[in-house]
């Protein structure tokens, strides 16, 4: 089981133009700061957040309880000119968990409803014995094939096209994909096998002409899984395996050493 939290800014669209449209550079900076905060605060509890659309953030929160969510929510209220609503859900796959969390928030009203404020709800249950599976995917030799040859924008366009195709393919497995900078993508993918990734990469290569590789990490928390995925990707980069997908799994002994419910540092 994987636990997902959907974070949504309350009534954000109307706020950006009240009483007049706010300066775009300020809005971009504010959105980026919120994303930074969410990663720092969930990250302090071994979680991981993805910016998606900035006014909606998706976080992997295995091991993070309701009280910690409330503390993070209060921290936003105390330091930002808006509030956020949160919904938590768990499921066998990442896509299904975010779907349940999204539906829970939607039950309280529209994202632009000035009455709906600081929702905090749980769709089903908190995960105690679940796991997180993350794939760290990147493009093979993007520097030699794109960065050093194409314009900055054309390279960016190729990366975004790859991202879209990757996200579409991952959804077929009830998984998700998020761009994390450079040519890198982090993909919550509980239930997927190495064979699934190899087949998916072949389809992407045939349609986009882009070769991908992935380190897969399986751990009790998002932090554990992402660390293992990073190591797996390095194994491929260093030529220590002939395959384009490499999986590392956290041992039971390592899982027992993890303590949850740290005090939020911010």
UniProtKB/Swiss-Prot annotation:
Catalysed reactions, semicolon-separated: GTP + 3 H2O = 2-amino-5-formylamino-6-(5-phospho-D-ribosylamino)pyrimidin-4(3H)-one + 2 phosphate + 2 H(+)
Keywords: GTP-binding, Hydrolase, Nucleotide-binding
Enzyme nomenclature, EC number: 3.5.4.29
GO biological process: biosynthetic process
Enzyme class, UniProt record, top EC level: hydrolase
GO molecular function ontology, one term from the record: GTP cyclohydrolase IIa activity
Protein name in the entry: GTP cyclohydrolase III
Source organism of this protein record: Methanococcus maripaludis (strain C7 / ATCC BAA-1331)
């Amino acid at each position: 089981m994987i636990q997902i939290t959907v974070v949504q800014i309350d009534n954000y669209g109307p706020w950006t133009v009240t009483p007049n449209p706010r300066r775009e550079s300020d809005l971009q900076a504010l959105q980026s700061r919120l994303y930074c905060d969410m990663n720092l605060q969930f990250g302090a509890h071994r979680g991981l957040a993805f910016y998606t659309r900035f006014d909606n953030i998706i976080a992997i929160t295995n091991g993070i309880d309701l009280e910690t969510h409330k503390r993070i929510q209060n921290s936003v209220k105390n330091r930002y000119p808006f509030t956020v609503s949160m919904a938590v859900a768990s499921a066998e796959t990442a896509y299904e968990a975010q779907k349940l969390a999204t539906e829970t928030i939607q039950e309280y009203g529209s994202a632009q409803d000035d009455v709906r404020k600081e929702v905090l709800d749980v769709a089903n249950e908190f995960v105690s014995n679940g796991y997180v599976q993350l794939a760290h995917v990147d493009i093979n030799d993007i520097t030699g094939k794109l960065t050093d040859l194409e314009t900055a924008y054309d390279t960016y366009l190729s990366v975004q096209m790859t991202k879209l195709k990757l996200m579409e393919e991952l959804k077929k497995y009830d998984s998700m994909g998020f761009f994390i900078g450079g040519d890198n993508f982090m993909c919550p993918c509980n239930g997927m096998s190495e064979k699934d990734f190899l087949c998916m990469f072949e389809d992407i290569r045939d349609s986009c002409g882009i070769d991908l590789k992935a380190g897969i990490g399986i751990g009790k928390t998002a932090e554990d899984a992402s660390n293992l995925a990073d190591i797996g990707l390095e194994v491929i980069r260093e030529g220590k395996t002939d395959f384009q997908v490499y999986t590392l799994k956290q041992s039971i002994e390592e899982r027992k050493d993890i303590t949850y419910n740290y005090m939020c540092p911010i």
